[in-house]
Amino acid sequence: MVPSIHKTSNRYRTIYFFLISLLITSTFADQQAWPLPEEVSASQLHEIPVLHTAFVQIGEELHYLNHPIRPENVHQLPVYDSIKGVCEGNCPKEANKNHATKTFNVLKLSGKGKLPMEMDPPMMDFGQNSVGTAQKRKIYIRNMRNEQIFLDAVVVNSIEFQASYFEQYKLEPHGVTSLEVVFLPREIGKRSTIVHFYTSVGVFTYKMQGNCDSNPYRISPFTGYRLPMNSSISKPIVIFNPYAYTMRITEIGTSGGNAHIELPHEVDSKLAEEPLQYWDIRPYQSKQIATLVLVGATSENSTVFVRIGSEIYLSSEHRKPNTDIYLTVPIEVLKRRGVYATDEILDFGLIRQGMKSEAKVFSVVQYQIGGRLEFETLYVEKGDHTAIYMEFASHPPIIVYPPTKGSVTLGPKADLVKVYLEGNRVQMSPQQQMKHISGHIIAVSRGGNYNVSIPYRADVFRGDLLPIGNDLSIQEDLRPPHQRIIRIENQLPFDVAIFNITLAPELVSHFSVRLIDRTALIRSGHISPVFVLKYNKKLPPTFDNSTIYLHTNVSTFNLSLSTYTGRMNVELISVDKNSFDFGFVERNDTRTIRFVVWNHNRAEMRLKNLAVPHRSAYRLYEVGVKSIGNFSDVRNDERLEYVEATDVDIPPMKGKIFDLELKVPSDGVVRNGNIIFETDLESKIFGVTYQVSTGSLQSIPEEICFGQTFPSKLVYRTLQVFNSFDEDMTVTRLTTLNEDPRFFFEGFDPKNPPVLRSGRLTNLGRVMFSPSAPCEHDYCYLGLPLGSSDGAWFTHGLTLPSNLPEIDSYLYKQLRKKYDALVNSGKHHINTTIILDTDKAKNIKIKTSAELVWPRLLTRNSIHFPLTALGNFTIVNLTLANPTNVPVAIQVIPLVIYPDAESLVELMRPNLVSELTDHVEMNETLMFSLRDTELFTLKSDSPVPKLREAFEYHLNHEMPRYNNEINIPRFTLSMILKPHMKIRLRLGFLPSDYTLRSSLLLIRNNLTAIEPVVMYGKGARIGVKVEGAEARSKKPLLFEIRHDHLTDCNNPKRLMHKLHSTLTVRRPFQVMNSGEVQFTVTNMSINGVPCENRGFRILNCYPFRLQPNETYALDIAYTPDFLTTTNEADLQLYMHMNGSAWIFPLASTVPGDMLAKCHQALPRPPFENIMYYSCVTALIFCLVCVLACAYLEGDRAIAVAIRQQFAIPRHVFDLNNLNKNNSTTTPVPTVPSTAKPESSIKKPTPATRPSTLRASSDAWLISRLLIGLANFIVKCVHLFWKWSLFWRREKADDKQSKSAKVTKKKNPVTMQKVEEFRQMLEYVGQQKRQQNSGELAPEFDEVEEEELAEMWAQRKDSGAQSSVVTDPEPPMSKSQRKKKRAAQQKENNNLEAPIIVQPVVQSPPVQNKMEPAKKTTPGPSPKPKGNNQRKKHVQVPPVTKTPVTPKTSIPPPTEPEKPIKPSEQKKPNAIPVERPKQPTPSKARTPSKTPSQSNRAQHPASSPAPIAPTSAPTDDFVHVPPTSLTSPDLFYRQFLSSMGMPMDAGMWDTPAAQAAMPFMNLWNYGGPLSAEQMEDLIRQASGVAPITNDSEGTTVTTPSDIGMTWGTSGHLGGDEESIGGEAAPDWIDEDVNVDDAEMDFSSMSAASKDIFKDDDIDNFNQQMKRQRSPSQASSTLSRKLENSPQKMGSRRLTIGSEKKNNQSSSSALNPNYDFTRTPGNPNRMQMSQNSIQPAPPATSIWGDNSNSDPWGTNTVSNPLSELEDDPLSLSHLGINLASTESSATGPMFTMFSGPEFNLWSSSSLFHPPTQQPSTSQMPQDTDNENDEKNN
């Protein structure tokens, strides 16, 4: 008892641990505790259509697992340890281990006595079973041992096999127990599994198997449902009654859980008062009995079982219980969001081949996505999907909407696509009767995040139920009543049960039918009598046919019942339709006439005893059967001969084709006869005749071959016939043997038939062949019209969607399948016969042949790029042509830009003509590229964009189907090819490595759908070797020159240079192409020099080409120079495919001991003597030039020394004495205004010439020639020397501007004097350069400049006024105040002591009669104007001239005002300036008339009289000498007189006077001096008493001719090109201090630079930083402006040009002043003197004056003699200013006439109008001009 208790406790303990392990196993089932089978990968788990559910059962507990269990994974299950307990330690450990782990195969070991347990049966075979029908069997287990065996567990790893637990878990010795196993198949096919029994003695493997066929109740396969949480789905339960009796449903139940059953009504039949017959299913009918609702309440993966109980009603009283029907529904409830299908499968059921199924809708819903989804891509995954046809349920993209807000259920259902199965597209082999089709349809959302798939299945069968013979054919003459049994043949692949038969309504009154048995079962392939047909009433004559319906368990079949006449129709394919007339034939000739016997009845017709009249002459052949309207059913190469009389059956509605052949006997005997066609109802007789003649009709060529063609292509051949008969014949018919409509004849007119002339060759025209003429199904294997459904898919693919591979593959296979079927049937070879009939010879046969092929737009099946070196680009040109007669739409796409290229390669690989390599390029865009797309740069005239746009326009605008939605990508080549149009394609290949690569060029088109072209390319290596050495090798190509090569160096003739040949060594080098690709050497050079350099020379220096492993001899010669022992160079070879050169080093060696000797032996160059003598001549010439230059330099040095000898000694320089005599005027005699000055006539001025040598009159001729030659050389050198001075001066100026000089600190006043003096010198020098063509004025160093400036300033101060009343200072602008503060700060830093300037008193202005008084407008601050600044047009009235002070070089204009206060006079460095009042706009345009103007208007003809000042001078001006500094002549006189110079008549001829003249032209004081004034000044400077002129004097110094016109000029405001036409600058009225001069000049220079040359701003600022003087800055700027006269002409107005259109003031200088006139004694001029009137001194520095005589004179003396050769002229003094012209055309001189002020006015200012009006006409002209401007 104790041992038993111990065993029991061990057993329960083991069970306890076993249950715990099962719970753990089931808990972690979702975590893949059970690994998958080897043949199923984890990635394919979601694609498994069946949800497999395994289970482990222990006792009555059943645990389902998510994945199948493999046997090797269950060994760790706990096993009862009962044996160990029995042994109690006596058993060895090995025995316990073996008992626990040993495995027994029951099937192999059964019956051999080796099993501890025997199982009966050893293997369970369930046999044949159907889906949904369960079979239950028992397995018996017997204990073969004498000990107990514990049965632990049963493990089954299949969901289709179930097992119960053992009836007894403890098996006593020799005891027996059992368990039940159930087979419930879910899918069709064989199923098997292994069951594992875990026991205490080991594991037993037991095999179970079964076969599953289709379910008789037509239950669809259970593929399982997937649905989200909190959702439900409904599945209708439809049951088919496969029995011949009624089946009643008695019970429906489910296994519970998430499945519920909904009956058709809410309550049961009793409460609804429905009869029980509602649940009856009639025989062979289907009925929905309930609805299965699946609810996703909990997340699980389980299986729902539905049991349906039924019974069979054999009669109303007899019932037979039926087996239960089990529906197994796997269900998986998921928590994840996504898209779910509403159906588990699209089941099409049984589809007959050739028919189209009903549409199945693929619908989806979304769950917890939150936004709407768009689907536009659907495709069929794998498998044979040619029979699946899909149509979008709505216009794509199809939107799947989310559920309403706040809802947790599924969203609304959205229909994606309608799916059809087309049975006519299913291909079967002749032996195959049924084909199972299945697969998956996948819908892809935009972005690819949410995809959904649904499986589909269908069974397509072939066959029908057909009546036998004429059982259902009623002859018209048959009279009722008549009864017959109808036999049916079952040609279906399965058995058929016919349970009912019905008639069409129109047959009910005439016929009656009844089945022979309750259910007629017809086995597959058998014939059985089915029903009895009774003919009760005669049919009307109009009756043709009707239908009888057979109701079977498969479907309803239709049988046709018809009437027939039994008559036949014999059609002869000949001209004569009533007899077989062969016409003229030749002996031993063979002719054939084809005829067709048509059976137009719906019943089979039999011809009886069909035979020919004479076997010796005639033969009868059966060709085939032809359908009505079909010409392609007959093959001419297969014929059956009828040897004897035979009965021939002709099928209904068809015709049988026969050939009657005539073989003319050799003896020429004519054997005519008859052919009889006889049936049961009628007979016909046709005669057979022929005539024997000599001759024949022969076609040229004998056989017409059309070659390869295809639909949409038209081909033609010319038909010619030679007539060898003796007489002419007329062609009566030209046709084909089968009357094929694809052949037609051009040029044959039956109304005007051609005549075949005897013995001639006649052209009968062209025979045309168009394969697509009838366009039947078999032959129209090409073309996708854009308006068709398939064409819409092609058009959709133009936008390159993601499912493009599926679209193209589908379209291609649809077309290709038709062609393959045509090839398989042999119909692609067309062999027909053309029949030629004439009036005499008939049925002449001409054979024709053609072959239908698959066309190609690209003539090449593959493209092989040549070997291409790495880094190079190869382009191949291809021709793409449209070979058809219709337009073809194309789209060319490289594989690298094709979407999902890998899928396309897999789909198209079986259809490729050439195989792809292992390396298919799909990523690198440039490796295989299409160069003619808009992805690359195209030429401006490229038609590619226009062709693409035309294609888009055709689709979007001319085809409303696409609704303007097609947008073709630009990186594809898309267009419409017109018929026979050709285009050129450029394909590029750029290798990246040396591997052979391949790719595809895809030509999408609506002719063949897609045309793939394989491209091959491989990178090649480039290699060049020269003499076996690689490029850049360290081993050079050596020229080794030895002693034996240099033996000729000892040749005496060579040492004497009598031999002109040189030593040259030549060596050939072998250049070998060691690479894989040919190359061309385009250029060769040595160290960068073509062909020859450094002594090396390539003899055959021209391009050459080398193939791989080919060599070329390159000859290189070396000519040593014997300077070094070694010489090195680089040989450079340039190739067409490589930009860089291949470099090979060259080297040469020469023995060192031979260098000197061989170098001495080298030949001299032939030009050595010529060069020698040329050099000697050049040296002599240079020596002569040097001597001439020395002479010129000495001459200049003497002239400079003479000038320095007469230099002015240094004196104290006082600025206060400059304007003492400025306030008085000196009366000057005047001349009549009508006198015309002769000096105004332009006279040539002799240029300055160098001193020359003179020969004596008695000198020899040779001496005179040498002296003349020397003078000529001096003149030439002088000309060059003169221009070199300019160049050297400019270089010096540039150096001076660039170098920063350190100058010592000087007194600012002295610096200002030096600056003013330097400006005067520069101005004089500029005038000399303009006159003397570039001669320079004398230059001074700083010391000399300071001394001369002191003396000049003292003389200037001596005539200045001692006391001056300053005007009040006008208010200053912000910029002026800022400038003044800067100047004061600079002055405070530089001045040692303040300098007080005495104020200057101004006299009231005197208005000129000739010019109205105007008020000036104060301008803005002196800011430079930009180029884009608007120019102001304001009239500027004249202002009085102000005396000049040395504080500034350019003081502003002033007008007299009241004296300022003494407090204001103490301001240092301030120059008083009068600021005129601002005029009103009306006054600016129309100035008021003054009294002088009114007087002038009253006396227009009178000459102008001098104008007296408005107020008399004060007492301060009485003691002042009469000479006024406002007159240039008087100032020169005073200046020279104060210098102590002699004033006698001959003093101007002295060298001192000539040397002093360059310093006299002081432009700062308004104008040049007259000759008398200059004479007085020179006398004063020489120590002679000056001649003073007072009011009573008789000797009057008159000014030059400019004095007359300076103030009376009529051009002061009229001409735009004159200075008078210029408006006063904006800075004319601003206060200018002494220290502001530099800033004023800087502003002027900066403005000019900004206007004319922006690039000079930086240089100018740098120069200003170096504190250049204003004269230097302005001179530099003037030189730059002189070098760009075009800029001056275009921008004449710069500073102060804002008022250019106003009438200018009277500040214009007189243009008639002759500046080259020599100031001498009055005897040199003839002059008239008039009364002298004083002139006011208030003149502006700008030349503006309010008096008509600013120089103190109102008359001018005109010179009467020419002064050009005068020794005192400025020309003889070395001063040649601007050339003097006449008063009408002479240059006008102003203070702005120098280069310093070219920035302000154009050079055209100095060229006034050609005609100078008279003085009497000036006022009127001036008024006219003023009026014009005012208007």
Curated annotation (Swiss-Prot):
Composition skew (Low complexity), residue ranges: 1223-1234, 1394-1407, 1435-1448, 1500-1514, 1808-1820
Biased amino acid composition, Basic and acidic residues: 1455-1467
Pfam families named in the record: Ig_TMEM131_2, Ig_TMEM131L_4, Ig_TMEM131L_5, TMEM131_like_N
A single Gene Ontology CC term: membrane
Source organism phylogeny: Eukaryota, Metazoa, Ecdysozoa, Nematoda, Chromadorea
Cytoplasmic side: 1191-1831
Organism this protein belongs to: Caenorhabditis elegans
Keywords for the protein's UniProt record, in alphabetical order: Endoplasmic reticulum, Membrane, Signal, Transmembrane, Transmembrane helix
Subcellular location: Membrane; Endoplasmic reticulum membrane
Lumenal-side positions: 30-1169
Transmembrane stretches, start-end: 1170-1190
Feature: compositional bias, Polar residues: 1480-1497, 1669-1687, 1702-1733, 1742-1758
Bias type Acidic residues, positions: 1338-1349, 1822-1831
Gene Ontology biological process: collagen biosynthetic process
Annotated PANTHER family: RW1 PROTEIN HOMOLOG, TRANSMEMBRANE PROTEIN 131 HOMOLOG
Region PapD-L domain, residue ranges: 118-294
Gene: tmem-131
Protein name, per record: Transmembrane protein 131 homolog
Tissue expression summary: Predominantly expressed in the intestine and hypodermis.
Subunit details: May interact (via PapD-L domain) with collagen proteins (via C-terminus); the interaction is direct and is involved in assembly and secretion of collagen.
Secretion signal span: 1-29
Principal place of residence: membrane
Similarity section: Belongs to the TMEM131 family.
Notes concerning its domains: Possesses a PapD-like (PapD-L) domain similar to bacterial PapD domains involved in assembly and secretion of bacterial pilus components. The PapD-L domain can bind collagens and is essential for collagen assembly and secretion.
